[in-house]
Amino acid sequence: NIYIFRKKELIHIRKGQVMEELIKEKVNKGLLSKEAALRISDTDKAYNCIGRDDYVKPLVSKEEIKLKKKDIIVMTTAGLQKNISVRELEDILVKRHRCRETAREIIETVKRKDNEGLDNLGLILIGI
């Protein structure tokens, strides 16, 4: 998932936009049927290009996102996302520490919970 943290609010950048572009490309090339494309749910399936042998080029969204000073780009893995609420993320991000300190606090908050999926905790924060 990708978010922009702006003015005390976490704005979810549509997680399906890259998946939709990939599906459209596969259908157009005849590598995926339209029926199969319709069955794919971007909430139930994760498509990870990192480390894939068949990864050829990055997908670029046609949707432009204008960043503002003091925005924070927040990228999370599914494992982290399942173990912390948006509200909890906002409460930590609003403190405005350095990104490294904020990332540590988010990871530690998740680790304190007794939840499943803690082996897949990934987080990237980019301050603008």
Task: Give the positions of each predicted feature.
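Residue-level structural signal for beta-strand termini and adjacent loop
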Residues: 8, 15-18, 89
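A broad, low-specificity signal marking well-ordered, structured residues that form hydrophobic/aromatic
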Residues: 10-11, 44, 124
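A short, polar/proline- and glycine-enriched secondary-structure boundary/capping micro-motif
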Residues: 4-6, 22-26, 85-86
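Short, acidic Gly/Pro/Ser/Thr-rich loop/turn segments
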Residues: 1-2, 20, 81-82
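Conserved, helical-rich catalytic subdomain that frames metal- and/or nucleotide-binding sites
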Residues: 14-67
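Conserved catalytic micro-motifs used in adenylation/nucleotidyl-transfer and phosphoryl/amide-
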Residues: 1-7, 11-13
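A generic structural signal for short, solvent-exposed coil/turn residues
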Residues: 5, 38, 115-117
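C-terminal catalytic subdomain
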Residues: 48-51, 55-76, 80-128
